């Protein structure tokens, strides 16, 4: 009985007053005293590349007595929280703002542990690996096969009703003469060199009738499904959406017939092949299901496939009364969350460029930069993507002063990464970014540290920059001083 209950009993002897349990309070051993609808639990944050607060952010949180916050208290990190009334789990862009410093330390420890678990090592599938399906056991000498070939050759435009009817007749007729398994018949049809598109579709449409009956081996069923995909790729450049919908419906119906999960029984190579197939068909829903199954095995698709998935998420939309509209940022980040282990160690240039537009706060940009510079492809990223980081951070805020501070922080990180020298390919980008934000003094400091080759271009940009958004910080005098400095260097 709680302390409140015992106190109430003392006030009213002989009566028992039960104080209802607060269903929103989470056990202290889980993550602290803060209800989820105020601050999300550490393991409910689903950001794909922001692992946890860096050292500077952690220090700022823990030394701020009143109202410590991350991301300036703005809703940035996608997270699942429990609704304060319905208690339903809801995806939101959460505000990480605390009333006091009291519970911050525990929360920071838990998000750090959660991030370490999330960003574990995974095995990346090779892009040139693929499933191999054994040849059918049926041979051309079989009387059954000869009769089946004659039928298929004379029916190139085959419906599944006709195929089903003919298979039943042939199977019954030859059953007493030779041992024939129905799954071998389907495999034989799909492996024929002169297979037609109608025959290919009819084979899959006929299959569910026999699953759980004549075909009750889930491994054999998976072999047939993969062979159907491989045969389809020989017939088309890409399997179309109706055919993929048919395949997914067969997978779902087979699960019910066999009372087994078809997807979880696929081996890693088969699962990766299905993911790649639905990805090429731009089916984001099924692709995500297959990707999460791979991730649960600590397996990831090839890096080109991952890049294609990120692009697909970026294009994803949802149906509304007003038609199809783009998915919200929080939903897209949630769809990318499963790729966190890849971003932690195998971030590529293409991935970096695709993820940058999701950054709406400088902490996200620097979190992505940290992963980029730790990646095994860091040299390529540093060579190709730094200017995109500069462009993104230079336009992040309305305040030219705030933008300048962020540009300077990025400049010194890149300088440290390159052992004290910013590459010329990036130097001009930093200078133009600072000029765009009217920070003329910082430009002069940079050029004093490291001369710039395109001095004429810098002078031209300075002359064109006449807008001062901030009421303080940068002035026209600074601009004239810089022009004089540059003209002396030209």
Swiss-Prot record:
Pfam families the record matches: AEP1
Keywords assigned by UniProt, alphabetized: Mitochondrion, Transit peptide, Translation regulation
GO CC terms of this entry: mitochondrion
GO molecular function, one term: translation regulator activity
Subcellular location: Mitochondrion
Record flagged with keyword Mitochondrion: yes
Keyword Mitochondrion annotated: yes
InterPro entries: Aep1
Highest taxon above the source species: Eukaryota
Biological function: Required for translation of the mitochondrial OLI1 transcript encoding subunit 9 of mitochondrial ATP synthase.
Family: Belongs to the AEP1 family.
Protein name stated in the entry: ATPase expression protein 1, mitochondrial
Encoding gene, per UniProt annotation: AEP1
């Amino acid at each position: 009985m709680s302390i409140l209950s015992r106190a109430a009993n003392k006030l009213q002897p002989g009566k028992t007053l039960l104080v209802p349990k607060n269903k929103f309070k989470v056990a202290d051993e889980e993550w602290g005293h803060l209800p989820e609808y105020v601050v999300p639990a550490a393991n409910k944050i689903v950001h794909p590349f922001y692992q946890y607060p860096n050292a500077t952010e952690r220090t700022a949180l823990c030394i701020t007595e009143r109202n410590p916050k991350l991301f300036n208290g703005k809703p940035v990190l996608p997270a699942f929280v429990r609704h304060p009334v319905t208690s339903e789990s809801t995806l939101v862009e959460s505000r990480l703002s605390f009333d006091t410093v009291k519970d911050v330390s525990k929360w920071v420890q838990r998000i750090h542990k959660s991030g370490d678990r999330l960003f574990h090592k995974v095995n990346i599938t090779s892009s040139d690996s693929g499933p191999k399906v054994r040849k059918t056991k049926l041979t051309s000498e079989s009387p059954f096969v000869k009769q089946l070939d004659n039928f298929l050759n004379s029916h190139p435009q085959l419906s599944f009703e006709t195929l089903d009817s003919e298979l039943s007749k042939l199977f019954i007729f030859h059953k007493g003469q030779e041992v024939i398994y129905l799954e071998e018949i389907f495999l034989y049809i799909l492996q024929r060199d002169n297979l037609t598109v109608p025959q290919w579709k009819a084979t899959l449409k006929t299959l569910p009738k026999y699953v759980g009956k004549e075909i009750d081996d889930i491994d054999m069923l998976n072999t047939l499904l993969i062979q159907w995909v491989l045969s389809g790729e020989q017939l088309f450049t890409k399997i179309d959406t109706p055919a993929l919908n048919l395949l997914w419906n067969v997978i779902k119906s087979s699960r019910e017939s066999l009372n087994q999960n078809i997807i979880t029984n696929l081996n890693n190579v088969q699962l990766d092949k299905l993911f790649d197939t639905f990805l090429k068909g731009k089916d984001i829903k099924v692709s995500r299901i297959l990707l999460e199954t791979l991730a649960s095995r600590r397996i990831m698709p090839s890096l080109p496939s991952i890049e294609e998935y990120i692009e697909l998420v970026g294009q994803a939309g949802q149906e509304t009364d007003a038609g199809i509209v783009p998915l919200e940022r929080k939903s897209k980040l949630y769809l990318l969350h499963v790729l966190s282990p890849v971003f932690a160690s195998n971030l590529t240039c293409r991935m970096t460029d695709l993820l940058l537009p999701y950054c709406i706060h400088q902490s996200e940009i620097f979190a992505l930069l940290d992963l980029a510079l730790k990646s095994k492809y860091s040299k390529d990223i540093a060579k190709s993507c730094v200017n995109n980081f500069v462009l993104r951070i230079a336009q992040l805020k309305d305040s030219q002063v705030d933008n300048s501070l962020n540009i300077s922080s990025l400049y010194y990180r890149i300088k440290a990464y390159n052992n004290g020298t910013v590459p010329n390919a990036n130097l001009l980008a930093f200078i133009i970014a600072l000029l765009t934000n009217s920070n003329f003094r910082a430009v002069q400091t940079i050029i004093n540290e490291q001369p710039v080759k395109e001095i004429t271009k810098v002078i031209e940009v300075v002359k064109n920059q006449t807008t001062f958004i901030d009421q303080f910080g940068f002035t026209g005098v600074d601009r004239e001083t810089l022009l004089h400095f540059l003209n002396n260097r030209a």
